[in-house]
Amino acid sequence: MSRALIPVLTVGVILTACAPKPPEGVDAAALDEAVARAVGSPSTCVVVEKRGGGVVYRYGTHTTCARSLPACDAPGLTTIQVQLDAARTGKVRTASCDTAAEASRGVAWASGPLPVLAGKSDRQMVYAVFMESGDALSGL
């Protein structure tokens, strides 16, 4: 999943040009569709923020993205916001684990800084993603 996700997010960053909305001429629905094909489900959340804060792109509802889910690589729960904050420090993270005792559902996390576009050092961004479902990829 992480290899499929990076190109989608990179394209998303290029298309959104650090604006809360895609630039003129970019179809936000097409970007959402590309994310949906790569990792989408009703329980998927993808957030790209400026390194200093401010949402550039969100896939998933606010309710979905506000969920607290198992951290997988540490005790307790974590959130998209905690992962975005860690990504701002340069931390890259991938983790997955079961969310149901009988292993019927799982969560997969990925987060980190996005590559800086050539000549665009003022456009540093971070991302955080989770997918929680029966289809969440293990060993992300």
Predicted regions mapped to residue ranges:
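Non-catalytic interaction/Regulatory regions outside core domains
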Residues: C18-C45, K50, V55-L140
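Sec-dependent bacterial lipoprotein signal peptides
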Residues: M1-T16
